[in-house]
Amino acid sequence: MKRRQLMRYAGAGLLTTMGTVIASEFSPSLAQKPSGGLSVQWLGHTCFLFSGNGLRILVNPFRPIGCTAGYRPPKVAADLVLISSQLLDEGEIEGLPGDPQILYEPGAYKVSGIQLQGISIAHDREGGRRFGNNVAWLWNQGGIKILHLGGAAAPIDLEQKILIGRPDLVLIPVGGGSKAYNPEEAKQAVSALNPKMVIPTHYRTQAADASNCEIVAVDEFLTLMDGMTVRRANSNAIALKSSDLPENGSVVQLLSYNF
């Protein structure tokens, strides 16, 4: 079932790029409402669960291996699953509970009143020739404009910057390696996007298999962001409202993982 859903939505993504809007397959009761409030839960690596407006969106479920070896499998209930690629550290959809809809192709989508944009960004520093393209996801939920960059490795170009605008919340890879931004590249992307809040992702933690993980810890990124406020949560989840975000400048938010 998961494979059929994934393939169906792959085709739909190509259609919506040409201007066709997907009809929602979710219950009308899940439609986005004007009232705000968003829960952001970190499930390890680049995997997050976003809950707001009665909708649960899971991004980048993974298989525990390599840099994610010590994390628990993120098998959580969701209404919609977004994946940045079909690599095991950000696109493992087998075994997810329930029957969520799955999107993985770039394009414009409308699901239960929420408009989502999948934006293609190279997954390596070779124009995608090694690892193909990564899909960054842009949407509004709970009154928050969210950009999840997945495993982006190429700079944000002018066309992408115009399409994205200024996000409220950016989730950005910072640990480097061959498939995603290193700390300096992440800093440049943050500068280009000027988000209100930055949540670093894709960095080395104690979950890593030391013999099979090439990414670095988050501290290197934080050092480069000298002068920017850093908040550290004592849990893996935060609740956000638009009023919590700075009007000027950016703040870095770190979440904790309970190993």
List each model region and its residues:
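C-terminal segment of N-terminal export signals and the immediately downstream linker at the start
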Residues: 22-51
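Metallo-beta-lactamase
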Residues: 26-27, 33-35, 90-135, 139-142, ...
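Pre-active-site segment of Zn-dependent metallo-hydrolases
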Residues: 47-106, 117-134, 152-163
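Conserved acidic residues
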Residues: 77-79, 168, 196
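Active-site-proximal loop/helix segments of hydrolase catalytic cores
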Residues: 125-193
